[in-house]
Amino acid sequence: MLLSLLFMTGCTDDGGDQVAQELSQNAALQERPTLEQEQARLTVVRDQVRDTLASELGLTAWNEADNGNAAGCADYPESDGFTAFLPLLALTGGVPDQQWADAVAVVEEVAAGAGFGGAETVVDQPGQHEVVLRGERESLLRFGTTKNATLRLEVGCHLTERDHS
């Protein structure tokens, strides 16, 4: 009976699995650029999209609407990585319906040069539009308009310079 109790309560170490997952996920993230490098790269992409929308379509009233933020990684929950959200750019007055298709084409063209795929429609109705483009390493570009337009880039999971070797 004592042997059965010892066997049933045995020496299982779920903590070992968690440590192994953390090591595995951190090793995968070591293959990626640092969070800071990816933030810098995607900030350039965001600014190129903004500048091209301004020069080609006259959409010029952009401003930074927040400071951005960071969170843990849903895809790598045991890792030391972070997902970052670049500061949101807002366009006062939005994109008129008659310019929406051209604006999406501009966003797709600029973003494609940085490894993003084509635009996936989230909402497309008069006065309200939104697309998302998926990039390398789980990055996302969100572009939408209602009364005002927004341009937001989300950096996929990366280790900070401190945690990257």
Where do the protein language model's features map onto the residues?
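C-terminal motif of bacterial Sec signal peptides marking the signal peptidase cleavage site
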Residues: 6-10
